[in-house]
């Protein structure tokens, strides 16, 4: 994980510098130091608004110019979205989900039980997997379903193993991420007829890529910091009395983010998602899945001999990729992690940031040119906030 953070550091600093400049122009020097870390509440605002009309990139890439994504799937219902996602996996050579699954293992969420984001629930009891799906129809849910079905197919492929090999190193999550990256491309949406009447210009492609990049590259340092705080606490590197101070030291070091105000000794500032890590290593899974998903995606695109920028590569219909995936999935945890990844990534697989950087190359080139033009500082000074 440290290697990934080191790999993406130069690119992250460019994005950080651009965001800080935009925030400084909007809120002034009394709120945002043009050479310092970004206040946490504004950093979180930028992250949450990545796909909104008030994003920091709005002056350059207006939300109004994005494709009408939700209208692409407006004629679907929830089961149509599941069938469309299932079609993607079948195009790779996976067996279809059987009648028993649709009749006994696929259930609609109770309306009273639906959470605000309305995410599906997956219960992996290999060889049986159960799914409670959300009835909400929007493009984001359409993509999420593609990821969820990766978990279902992973369970099916490893079901013949002894039960003590059912653990899959959580690789079903990056598989889902890679499928989502392909299913969301303009190339794929046009191929399956969802966007046949919409023309994707280079400007629109950059608009989409930039918003994806903000969401991805601002989340990765947070996943890392949350994981490191927990690790440092458990291995005795930091004492519990210093945990909040340690948290902010890591946020400044890795994310260039500081608290919005001085913090008293009694403060505990971890966000809610930090606590998700306590039982299931949630933030660690998110970090590895995000980064490894781009590795899988790039590997699949290389297998298709894709030409041009990586962010519009669609591997739908490629049986060889499906065979590679099934070969990896069928191993469960019967082989070590590295040997399992070899089935998809080839020799000597390792976790690094290079695939992610390759995906966002056009955005990063734009950022570097814009930052040179604006003559902004790249990187950040230490925080002046007092943290006791």
Feature locations, PLM:
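Active-site-proximal, well-structured secondary-structure segments within enzyme catalytic domains
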Residues: 1-132, 198-218, 317, 336, ...
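Post-HExxH zinc-binding segment in Zn-dependent metallohydrolases
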Residues: 4-9, 13, 168-205
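C-terminal, non-catalytic "cap/extension" segments appended to globular domains
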Residues: 45-63, 75-80, 84-87, 111-112, ...
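Acidic/polar loop patches that form or flank catalytic/metal-binding clefts of enzymes
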Residues: 90-101, 160-165, 185-195, 240-244, ...
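Alpha-helical recognition segments enriched in aromatics with Gly/Pro capping
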Residues: 101-112, 123-127, 144, 148-157, ...
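Short, solvent-exposed loop/turn segments at the edges of secondary structure
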Residues: 124-128, 171-174, 224
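Acidic/His metal-coordination segments adjacent to aromatic residues that form catalytic metal sites
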Residues: 128-136, 159-167, 205-210, 268-277
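Active-site recognition of the HExxH zinc-binding catalytic motif
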Residues: 137-159, 173-177, 181
